[in-house]
Each structure stands twice: as structure tokens, then as C-alpha cells.
């Protein structure tokens, strides 16, 4: 199972980083941290004047597709997203399978004003402090990778640090975890992280089970304005899109098309 492999690798990396930069060191650096987390919920909530909120992803590679974009400049890509009207930016920081780096958060934060999501396999509070230090405004918490207790504890610590979390689900069991934890933002990933199979009907199946008042994000397999319109009718507020944008020559124009602005 690829998810198990990634989590195993993440744990090994964490042990090294904790020795190199102990939590006490990270905690001290928070006192000098210039990055104050920016509001996320109001940015992602669908509104009449901006119904299709976009979380545009900075992603060089993936385990299923390999390298997606050869000419990879995270800051230049982020600027294209800003030009296209994206509402937030997702930054892959997992190094082995996605060729991401946590420094990308800081680099992008210096140049674009939108909230930044640290997209990684977060299993430890240490990673949440890291996210804050490097400039993230919200983090991804994958329900499938965490127990109910772990998810709740990590979510509450995220809030304690002043950040927000996108809690990702793929089935009813994940949704129960997310509701138990008190998630405000719930992401439905159409892709199964264990098999990489895609099920675009998942949003339609799971949205009716989500309590009112939650911000709903659709993830994976989205590549057209028509899809965005239909999913929005079902109750989706925001759309996390990565690979489709990463394969474009004119990223800003494609973001506008997805939003229906071009």
C-alpha cells in the first residue's frame, strides 16, 4: 500500500528532523516568526460573487504520475495562480514521492498574498509547528492516515497554533472521524490513496452526510468549468486542483477558465 509506505518514510524523516531541529528550537523560533496565519474559512466559502473557490496546487511530481512539470519554479507558478484568480495555494512539502520541500512555503509566502496550505502526510504535532514557522496558514490532515483520537488531537493543536486544517476524507468511516474531531473544512478526495483509483461520484454520495455549516472542498480529477459548476450545485465550496494546472503552458488562463472568468 503506497499510503503505508509514505507514512513509514515520513516517520523516519521526522526522527531525523527532530534530532536536527528539536521541538524546543522550533518553538523558540516561533517567538520571532514573521508569519501570522491568515483567515482561511472566509476565503474558501462559496459566495454569490465568487462561487467557485480554487485551491491551486504547487506540485512537481506524484507517486502515480512521476514528474508532472519539468520546468518547476514554485514562486513563478504561485504568481500565475494569483494572476488567474486562485483563492488559496496548496504547497506539496513531501520530498520523496512528490518532490516537494517545506522551504517552498516560505518562498511563496514572500510573493503572494493568498493563504497557503501545507500539503503533506501530517502525523505529528512537530509538523504543525514546522508548518507555522515556514509560513502555512492551514494544513492537510488525512483521516485515512490517522486514528480518530490522533485526528482530534492534531486538529485541536492546529487551532491552538492559530492555523486551520483541511481534513481529507474518502469514505464514510473517514467522515465519521472528521465529524468526531470537529473539522470545519472537509475535503472529499475522489482518489483512493491506497489504490489510486478515481471515483468522481464520491462527492455526490458523501455530501448529504456532512453536517450543515461545514466548508466542503472537492479534490482530484477536476479539470473543467462544467465539473466545478455541477459540484458546486451539490454543495462544494472550493476545488483543490493540481495536476491539471501543472500541465498547462498558460496557467493563469486555465485557472480563469475553471472559474468561468475566461
UniProtKB/Swiss-Prot annotation:
It comes from Nitratiruptor sp. (strain SB155-2). This is Indole-3-glycerol phosphate synthase. The gene is trpC. SUPFAM superfamilies: Ribulose-phoshate binding barrel (SSF51366). InterPro entries: Aldolase_TIM, Indole-3-glycerol_P_synth, Indole-3-glycerol_P_synth_dom, Indole-3-GlycerolPSynthase_CS, RibuloseP-bd_barrel. Pfam families: IGPS. Belongs to the TrpC family. Keywords: Amino-acid biosynthesis, Aromatic amino acid biosynthesis, Decarboxylase, Lyase, Tryptophan biosynthesis. The keyword Amino-acid biosynthesis applies. Pathway: Amino-acid biosynthesis; L-tryptophan biosynthesis; L-tryptophan from chorismate: step 4/5. GO terms for molecular function: indole-3-glycerol-phosphate synthase activity; phosphoribosylanthranilate isomerase activity. GO terms for biological process: L-tryptophan biosynthetic process. Its EC number is 4.1.1.48. NCBIfam families: PRK00278.2-4, PRK00278.2-5. It comes from the Bacteria. It catalyses: 1-(2-carboxyphenylamino)-1-deoxy-D-ribulose 5-phosphate + H(+) = (1S,2R)-1-C-(indol-3-yl)glycerol 3-phosphate + CO2 + H2O. Signal peptide: none annotated.
Amino acid at each position: 500500500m503506497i499510503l503505508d509506505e509514505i507514512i513509514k518514510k515520513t516517520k523516519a524523516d521526522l526522527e531525523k528532523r527532530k534530532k536536527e531541529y528539536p521541538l524546543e528550537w522550533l518553538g523558540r523560533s516561533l517567538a520571532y516568526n514573521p508569519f501570522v496565519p491568515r483567515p482561511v474559512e472566509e476565503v474558501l466559502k462559496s459566495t454569490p460573487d465568487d462561487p467557485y473557490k480554487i485551491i491551486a496546487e504547487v506540485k512537481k511530481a506524484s507517486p502515480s504520475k512521476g514528474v508532472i512539470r519539468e520546468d518547476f519554479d514554485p514562486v513563478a507558478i504561485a504568481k500565475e495562480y494569483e494572476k488567474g484568480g486562485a483563492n488559496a495555494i496548496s504547497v506539496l512539502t513531501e520530498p520523496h514521492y512528490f518532490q516537494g520541500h517545506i522551504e517552498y512555503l516560505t518562498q511563496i509566502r514572500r510573493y503572494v498574498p493568498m493563504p497557503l496550505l501545507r500539503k503533506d502526510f501530517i502525523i505529528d504535532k512537530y509538523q504543525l509547528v514546522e508548518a507555522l514557522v515556514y509560513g502555512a496558514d492551514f494544513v492537510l490532515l488525512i483521516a485515512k492516515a490517522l486514528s480518530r483520537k490522533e485526528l482530534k488531537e492534531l486538529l485541536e493543536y492546529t487551532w491552538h497554533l492559530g492555523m486551520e486544517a483541511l481534513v481529507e476524507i474518502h469514505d464514510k468511516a473517514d467522515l465519521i472521524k472528521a465529524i468526531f474531531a470537529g473539522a470545519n473544512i472537509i475535503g472529499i478526495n475522489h482518489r483512493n490513496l491506497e489504490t489510486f483509483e478515481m471515483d468522481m461520484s464520491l462527492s455526490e454520495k458523501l455530501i448529504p452526510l456532512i453536517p450543515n455549516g461545514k466548508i466542503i472542498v472537492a479534490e482530484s480529477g477536476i479539470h473543467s468549468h462544467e465539473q466545478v459548476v455541477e459540484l458546486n450545485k451539490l454543495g462544494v465550496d472550493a476545488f483543490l486542483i493540481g495536476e491539471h494546472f501543472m500541465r498547462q503552458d498558460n496557467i493563469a488562463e486555465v485557472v480563469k477558465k475553471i472559474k468561468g472568468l475566461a
